């Protein structure tokens, strides 16, 4: 592979070099024709301007090595092997954990569940407090509520707390 890459970079370098020299010769020949046509007597001035033009071209042309480095294409390493080994190791860890968990007695399992409880489980937001209070008012603490059956014969005491709205007043929601 390294031979292919070096051959490819050498080829691109030669192509770039020929393009650069071709552009320089074209600009020199066209400028020399124009200068000879317009200025027959100023040969010395032409040579000086050509030299300064060449110096300017050399400064504008980037180094050949920099251009070769820009055209180098590196092949990406395949990550499929890494992914498969990672997933198999996770699978092995999960199966070992499940086996150990099945061997443990129920008291130990309960301790594990309590240990892995989230610290935010015990925190109660104001919204959830209001919801719990409303549930207690609607359904009572001791009654078991079946969410599949709707009971429309609830207490009327809960309705008395509602705010009465006058029909004459306009409310914007």
Curated annotation (Swiss-Prot):
Which cysteines form disulfides? none
Which cellular components does GO assign to this protein? nucleolus; nucleus
**InterPro entries reported for this sequence:** Spo12 (IPR007727)
Q: Where is this region: Negative-charged tail?
A: 159-173
Q: Which GO terms describe its biological process?
A: meiosis I; negative regulation of protein localization to nucleolus; positive regulation of exit from mitosis; sporulation resulting in formation of a cellular spore
The PTM Phosphoserine maps to 118, 125
Which stretches are tagged as biased composition: Polar residues?
1-12
Top-level division of the source organism's lineage: Eukaryota
List the protein's name. Answer: Sporulation-specific protein 12
């Amino acid at each position: 592979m390294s031979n292919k890459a070096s051959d490819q970079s050498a080829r691109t370098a030669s192509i770039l070099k020929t393009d650069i020299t071709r552009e320089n010769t074209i600009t020199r020949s066209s400028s020399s024709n124009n200068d000879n046509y317009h200025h027959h007597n100023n040969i010395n001035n032409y040579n000086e301007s050509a030299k300064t033009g060449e110096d300017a071209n050399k400064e504008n042309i980037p180094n050949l090595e920099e251009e070769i480095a820009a055209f180098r294409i590196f092949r990406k390493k395949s990550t499929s092997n890494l992914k498969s080994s990672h997933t198999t190791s996770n699978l092995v860890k999960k199966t070992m954990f499940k086996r150990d968990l099945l061997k443990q007695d129920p008291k130990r399992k309960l301790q594990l569940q309590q240990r892995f409880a989230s610290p935010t489980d015990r925190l109660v937001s104001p919204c959830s407090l209001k919801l719990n209070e409303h549930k207690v008012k609607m359904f009572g603490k001791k009654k078991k509520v079946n969410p599949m059956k709707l009971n429309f014969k609830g207490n009327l005491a809960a309705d008395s707390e509602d705010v009465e709205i006058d029909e004459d007043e306009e409310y914007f929601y």
